[in-house]
């Protein structure tokens, strides 16, 4: 059971609901910087730096004597309808300032009211990341304040394998420790307009977040990006977060330090890891590539400073998309004491062991287990690359669609040979054929654009040789473009059912294309340029009926006639 204890003052917390707050006057503040986009450097040096970033995070030869160390702080929006300290809705897409309580905007006299349901996705995240729920006096308990004083989970870890895209120097895998996870609340959203005007939307205030802090055990920018990607996949798989980095539901800060391997260990220690160099923190990175490129830029900057005889200052820095350098935001000397203290209106929260046990029993399949299933289960039989792509695309929606299509196709084909791999075929169509249409149209994923039932029916017709490959792709394109007819109706209306050519008809078509291209026939016969057979197959499809020509049969006839 999860329960909130009564405040020691015995005073219940009430919320005075506010349906909507309208600001009659815009909020003005003199802008400290000019508006407009910062010009990117066009120098040869900057171009070469960006090219090096695109090639990956491996250090150049001149940096091999330097050790990079990275720790990551991930901030993720919890998947919950409730705010952390008020009863207002946590919905983000509603009208600005429509989901706020008096406490959200800190009106005098308003009091926080902790919402226990926000703990459920937070605990799921801790379990999935192998953390221990914090224990005090034999109970799972921690004090609440507007930022929780004590982390509710500690001492976790995740494993990154080669399939996760780690750096080559990390070998087959690396384990990264999770120092702690704590709950936080989000802040208001601001929008900057011309004339030093800012619009404020308080809907996001008090929306619950978790902050996941890794140990500084990462030594490659590539592995750091892989770590963030893996944690995002884990959080999504257990329903702990709303969306990923792609949709703004997850952000990362990185702590970066370097030290020379050939010299004595550094004087700094962070989170129990000693012998490190002075670290800097890069804030608010919103994509996996941003994590990787920002670390590379800061690594190179610190090495250049130290080589020139300078010292690294503890500071907070920023990085902008397209930039090859980080920029200073503010100084940061030592650990900051935020002087958090318990709120007298918020009593301790006790999380029962039965809740932990129940959530642990019902935790969904984690990404590594899912990857293993998609690769090793004969029903799917995907390659590791395709399986990972499906898991990561569209917050897992593409994977659900794929699995639905596989199940439907299997029910449509109880009589087909066991050699037919439904999972592999469907995977190819979902990732490449359907994925190609999405890329070409720049459309977002929508599982109903081509329902899984329709895709399975197309693949079923193709595998039974009732339609040709080109007809199958045409059917998919028509469904994708909004044709609401059933697949069977389109096949009937367009007369797409395959009617095989006779052997005599194949020979006649083959002889015709050979007669038109005697030089290429000679090159195949005399020089063994068999790759040109495919061109001849294409010509047979061009002069014949493409809906009746089987590429394999056409090539067999061509080989028979040309190589006899």
Curated annotation (Swiss-Prot):
SMART domains: GatB_Yqey (SM00845)
EC id: 6.3.5.-
GO molecular function: ATP binding; glutaminyl-tRNA synthase (glutamine-hydrolyzing) activity
Catalyzed chemical reaction(s): L-glutamyl-tRNA(Gln) + L-glutamine + ATP + H2O = L-glutaminyl-tRNA(Gln) + L-glutamate + ADP + phosphate + H(+)
Disulfide bonds: none
UniProt subcellular location: Mitochondrion
Transit peptide: 1-88
GO biological process: glutaminyl-tRNAGln biosynthesis via transamidation; mitochondrial translation
Any Pfam family: GatB_N
GO cellular component: glutamyl-tRNA(Gln) amidotransferase complex; mitochondrion
Stretches for region Disordered: 26-63
Class of this enzyme: ligase
Keyword annotations from UniProtKB, A to Z: ATP-binding, Ligase, Mitochondrion, Nucleotide-binding, Protein biosynthesis, Transit peptide
UniProt similarity note: Belongs to the GatB/GatE family. GatB subfamily.
Function: Allows the formation of correctly charged Gln-tRNA(Gln) through the transamidation of misacylated Glu-tRNA(Gln) in the mitochondria. The reaction takes place in the presence of glutamine and ATP through an activated gamma-phospho-Glu-tRNA(Gln).
Self-association state and partner proteins as the record states: Subunit of the heterotrimeric GatCAB amidotransferase (AdT) complex, composed of A, B and C subunits.
Protein name (database record): Glutamyl-tRNA(Gln) amidotransferase subunit B, mitochondrial
Organism: Ajellomyces capsulatus (strain G186AR / H82 / ATCC MYA-2454 / RMSCC 2432)
